[in-house]
Amino acid sequence: FKAGDYIAAAGIEGTVKEISMLCTKIITVDNKDIFVPNSEIAGGKITNFSSEPVRRVDIVIRAGYNNDIATVKKALTEAVVATDKTLNDPAPFIRLSGYKEYAVEYTIRVWAQGSDYWNVYFDLLENISKAYAANGVKGAVPGMNIYMQEDK
């Protein structure tokens, strides 16, 4: 990694501002300066989010079991299309990905320029909410059945 890269290392995530002989200065997303000893960085896993020009945005979203799968996928597709700055190549991925106790899970994967990652992420979440409402898709809400025993 180099100055200007966005990394996760030694339990810290942020933008590298300086690399010196003894430590690396990282600025977090909430604008805190963190000075991390290079020995901590070198001894652990480093994720460089800036090394490639494009990044994949992954969102796992739930819908209630009472929704038609095709309707949910249609709504999610509409949300992706409505989200600016998503890339068409590689193509977006929208699939049913799991069954939970009270919900069906869907995975959405789209690609964006690294600099657009967070805007695409948050805009897509907002567009999913709008598309669910427009298509009548109901969210997943945990349910509870209570059985009352009658006194005899």
Question: What are the language-model segments listed below?
Answer:
Residues 1-89:
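Soluble accessory domains appended to multi-pass membrane transport proteins
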Residues 49, 63, 67, 77, ...:
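Solvent-exposed, non-transmembrane regulatory segments of membrane-associated proteins
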